[in-house]
Amino acid sequence: QFLDAEGGGLLEFCRLPFFSLSLFSTPPMSDITYSWNEYIRLNEELVYKVAKSGWQFDCLICLSRGGMRPGDFFSRIYGKPLAVLATSSYREAKGTVQSNLDIAECMTGLAELKGKVLLVDDMVDSGKTIQEVVAHLKKRYPAITEIRVAVLWWKAHSVLKPDWHCVYFEDSPWIHQPFECYDDLGAEAFSEAIESGKTLGRLQ
């Protein structure tokens, strides 16, 4: 049980013996790959940091697709509905180069946005995406009083500093997340892999 009787606390969760995630710090490199176990641990650490800060939020928003998994951790542990806002900027060079940002007009999961908002994503890279999303939300939903940002990874060249993060990179490695094994695989190739006995998303 993570929630107290009123559903407003994270009593047992905050007592868990979390250790520093500095073990995930790495020397400068162009690519870094995370296993499922490391990825899950990062998500738990992020929720823990927000919980221990004592800051309470009224609404929870994640950015699609990168923020959906971290957002799900927050939604389940806090017992709050998760709103999903679709954004897209990585399009060129097979998804590794940022182009113009598109922000969806509609958001799923919440009928009304107001009060304090926690915005969750997987990383702050250039920082421009979250910066534009924050401006968009404040303009479109004037009842919002405060927006704070929580991410797994924060890169030094970002124009925005998140309120909470797990790993800080002084350089700008390309981060490979464990579920990328499914990217652009296609239903036919996926089916063939499963039929041949392969487990693409195995725990590592």
Segments and roles (model prediction):
Residues 1, 9-204:
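PRPP-associated nucleotide enzymes
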